[in-house]
Amino acid sequence: MTDATIRHDHKFALETLPVSLEDEMRKSYLDYAMSVIVGRALPDVRDGLKPVHRRVLYAMHELKNNWNAAYKKSARIVGDVIGKYHPHGDSAVYDTIVRMAQNFAMRYVLIDGQGNFGSVDGLAAAAMRYTEIRMAKISHEMLADIEEETVNFGPNYDGSEHEPLVLPTRFPTLLVNGSSGIAVGMATNIPPHNLTDTINACLRLLDEPKTEIDELIDIIQAPDFPTGATIYGLGGVREGYKTGRGRVVMRGKTHIEPIGKNGERERIVIDEIPYQVNKAKLVEKIGDLVREKTLEGISELRDESDKSGMRVVIELKRNENAEVVLNQLYKLTPLQDSFGINMVVLVDGQPRLLNLKQILSEFLRHRREVVTRRTLFRLKKARHEGHIAERKAVALSNIDEIIKLIKESPNAAEAKEKLLARPWASSLVEEMLTRSGLDLEMMRPEGLVANIGLKKQGYYLSEIQADAILRMSLRNLTGLDQKEIIESYKNLMGKIIDFVDILSKPERITQIIRDELEEIKTNYGDERRSEINPFGGDIADEDLIPQREMVVTLTHGGYIKTQPTTDYQAQRRGGRGKQAAATKDEDFIETLFVANTHDYLMCFTNLGKCHWIKVYKLPEGGRNSRGRPINNVIQLEEGEKVSAILAVREFPEDQYVFFATAQGMVKKVQLSAFKNVRAQGIKAIALKEGDYLVGAAQTGGADDIMLFSNLGKAIRFNEYWEKSGNDEAEDADIETEISDDLEDETADNENTLPSGKNGVRPSGRGSGGLRGMRLPADGKIVSLITFAPETEESGLQVLTATANGYGKRTPIADYSRKNKGGQGSIAINTGERNGDLVAATLVGETDDLMLITSGGVLIRTKVEQIRETGRAAAGVKLINLDEGETLVSLERVAEDESELSGASVISNVTEPEAEN
């Protein structure tokens, strides 16, 4: 090492400056972040493209790889792109080309590919040396007019080439094909849309720039995915359009086919899947769920997809509900998926979050700039051509002199000097201007010096004109046609007038944009692929539950369960029946009713509170199952028992819950008052000391009410109440003692029509009740029946049953309507043979009847096998009972279950235990 080298190194070391590592990292990271954001990850709001997409299309355009030309090898295009414009790996460029050619990834493909470009199953494309591509026809609309100085160009990475910084696209590519990308600290995810819908929104915004975003959303409505499927619910979509961030829920499109001659089995066929879902992985996921027994209703799974379309077949087991399995697939697999909207784009080189209207407005602003720049370019070109035409006119007017001048000049330079040095005769130029109706200034190209052109002395040629004359051959000079020159000049003048008019009138630019958008819509518009279900939403547990009629049983010890009604076949009267539930010693089933799995169970307790729960949430068990303690299903206080249960589907304002207590008190409350029940329950009725709730039923406000006592008596009255101006507030507490004596005097009088004066006034949940039936000391209400007055003509009858298993059916008409508060009349004999009355219900001739004993035995029998008798008759044997066993409940199973909507039975409810 020489001394000079040492001195040089020492000098270099002395010039080293200390730098803060923190500052350097911050600066370098920000530079890198902005490079990724602007140069790689985010699309430009104007043309909807990221740099790599733009460079691919421009390279194909430069190679004239047009839609109607021969295909070129993908490797050729990749080489041009990375060599001229995109200094990155070839795989990144080829992956971009592949995606732009996939009809399941792009709503409108921008590249026409030939060969294997991958599949919806996630299969990779063939290598670039095997595939061939060319531009799709619609891609030419993105590059239209690019040679007319419509967009800015910039140098490529090494300054050897120039590339467009944006494309002059004629349609809103950003929305039409969408975009996705992950930058540093931000990301974008924009779904594709239907071209027709998007252009219609642009046209609306062109006509009315102040159009509200809601109106634009009404036009576009939702994304339109290349794989079709169904947009499920519009709440998240609208949020995304309004704020730039939202969520699109997508469901695969399916249909259900029967299997077998009788259609005893079904299959689900998947025709379309959500956007960006891998079909092979979807099928694999379904198979895994079947193997794990998470999905138990599927017997076979196969993919029958081919070139004609998608077809994934899911065969179901016998008696499986296809709709329920389908909802399980939606919940557990990507057959239902979501697309997160995050519309972050580059606006003037800066990342911004835009809403739908802002994106459309930015596109239209871009189109306005493109049309303006294109018109300026064409005006400049027309003026230049006019300038050249004037050269021809001058040459024709002075042809002999010009030929002589050229011949006498020793070289071209001297000839040019002579042409520029003097004015020339300009009669033909003046004639052309006169015919066109334009002044000379409108024709002058920009930048032309003042002493050039038509002057008083004649016409002074420009250097461009002189060069053009010298380049003309003698044959061309002598062959100039005056008429042709004048006609050509006139056409140029017309174009110039038009271009100047366009530039001076913004409305003309707007019309040009409109016409071009209409043309795009006509040439490329199509129907939506994705259907829209505006009322969709997240899948609730209820969607996965089949609608079935269930027998709900509640034991005296508080065990509840459900069983399908199909578990029981009708038997002849007097049979032994099937075991409905295994009960513990000294426990028995006291309540039984039929409800749909999607019904709400309104559970009213002996303490006058209300709880509710969906039927499908109750434990389902076999005949040997006890069920689950009801206090594990709903929150009950110590000493609180469910004493009445009502099954309802909805909570309309014009319906009521009618209550009856053991001491004969009645009350009604609007059903809607119970639609929001707290976990610990809400108060339903205020009870007097020693009283407890017996029954509850849904009524329409003018139903007939029947109360049955354990002593075999019944009373029938109408609930209708006609409000008068003197009535107190409907939700005020009702004093039960005030009018009892007055009511008793008239209660047993005949009352054939509801008067509205002796009915039951609606009250609030916290109030008490009115006397419905007067009882002796040993009497208590055991059953409540409600029905519409016209039911009397329907053929339905009152069936009563006693503790010792006897019963009968009696026409409703045998029970005359009375005023409420009376002692009632005989319904069935309650002597030693029959025992106390335990339950009553309405039945039809073709119905079945379910009977339940204290031993847990259940029998289903035909009503027609039970003899019809009068009110005073003792009845017939309904069920054979073991010694010490009693009948505790019954339930009608209607031939048409819809008939049950007006009737309810809750029977044999026990008194609350006394506090110690």
From Swiss-Prot:
The primary location reported for this protein is: cytoplasm
Q: Which Pfam families match?
A: DNA_gyraseA_C (PF03989), DNA_topoisoIV (PF00521)
Biased composition, class Acidic residues, residue ranges:
739-748
Example of a GO cellular component annotation carried by this entry? chromosome
Where is the protein found, in the record's own terms? Answer: Cytoplasm
One of the protein's GO biological processes: DNA-templated DNA replication
EC numbers listed for it are 5.6.2.2
Keywords (alphabetical) are: ATP-binding, Cytoplasm, DNA-binding, Isomerase, Nucleotide-binding, Topoisomerase
Per the Swiss-Prot or TrEMBL annotation, the motif GyrA-box is positioned at: 571-577
Question: Topo IIA-type catalytic domain location, by residue?
Answer: 42-544
Molecular function (GO) terms for this protein are:
ATP binding; DNA binding; DNA negative supercoiling activity
| CDD domains (alphabetical) | TOP4c
Q: Where is this region: Disordered?
A: 739-774, 897-916
Q: Which reaction does it catalyse?
A: ATP-dependent breakage, passage and rejoining of double-stranded DNA
Q: Where is the active site?
A: 130 (o-(5'-phospho-dna)-tyrosine intermediate)
Broad class of enzyme this protein falls into: isomerase
Database matches in PANTHER family: DNA GYRASE SUBUNIT A, CHLOROPLASTIC_MITOCHONDRIAL (PTHR43493:SF5), DNA GYRASE/TOPOISOMERASE SUBUNIT A (PTHR43493)
Misc remark: Few gyrases are as efficient as E.coli at forming negative supercoils. Not all organisms have 2 type II topoisomerases; in organisms with a single type II topoisomerase this enzyme also has to decatenate newly replicated chromosomes.
Whom does it interact with, and what assembly results?
Heterotetramer, composed of two GyrA and two GyrB chains. In the heterotetramer, GyrA contains the active site tyrosine that forms a transient covalent intermediate with DNA, while GyrB binds cofactors and catalyzes ATP hydrolysis.
Relate the protein's function as given in its record.
A type II topoisomerase that negatively supercoils closed circular double-stranded (ds) DNA in an ATP-dependent manner to modulate DNA topology and maintain chromosomes in an underwound state. Negative supercoiling favors strand separation, and DNA replication, transcription, recombination and repair, all of which involve strand separation. Also able to catalyze the interconversion of other topological isomers of dsDNA rings, including catenanes and knotted rings. Type II topoisomerases break and join 2 DNA strands simultaneously in an ATP-dependent manner.
The UniProt similarity line reads: Belongs to the type II topoisomerase GyrA/ParC subunit family.
The protein's name in its UniProt record = DNA gyrase subunit A
